[in-house]
Amino acid sequence: MDFIERIFTDFSEIHGDRAYGDDEAVACGMARLDGQEVLVIGNRKGGSTKDRVRRNFGMPHPEGYRKALRCMKIAEKFGRPVISFIDLPGAYPGLGAEERGQAEAIARNLLEMSRLRVPTISVITGEGGSGGALALAVSDRVLLLENAVYFVITPEGCAAIRWNDPTKKQVAADAMRISAAEVASLGCVDDIVTEPPGGTHTDHAAGAGFLGVKLKEHLAELQAMPMNRLVTERQKKFRNIAQFYTEV
């Protein structure tokens, strides 16, 4: 929300998924970027302990993903670009979330985002964890802040599973190649956003300034492209990420 408040104006939040409830870990609403109407999606981790618990430490429930998708379809109906901000360790894996269809909600977002007929941009501002992050990041442009990370599992979780030793988190992080430069080299993101010295958390205004410039540049490029080409290239990009090769 720090970025939304500093980069956009006239943010008007939309609540609820019209099916179960309103997930406070996910915020969606219409806003203006340099006067242009856009849909903004962001997740909230909370500040105080009480606030973090209320927002589930930033981990969305199914209703959070469904709320985001409902808003994306509204944006598509009115021809508004979609910009999402992601900083979450993953989707919430609790029993209630599974009973309400967490896997289906994530899969549905992946499908629908891949064919949205509006320009889409996703920004990973801190941590982008697994399918929970990808469910908000199937976009024409995926940006990654210079000090952010993008992974299929946290290094601690990987170390615990692979070696049964969470203290080997640095070994896991190195093997997983989760830094901005490494993720970009793998073709998983389209651009790295420069941060102020010490990181954006030390100077939110400067960090928002850097990111705002990038958003305007990429949005202008996307809006100059034919819609059929946008959708085709978006789908091709994510299919190519999934390709791998082996040597016999």
Please identify what each model-predicted range represents.
Residues M1-A160, N164-T167, D174-V248:
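Terminal-region recognition feature
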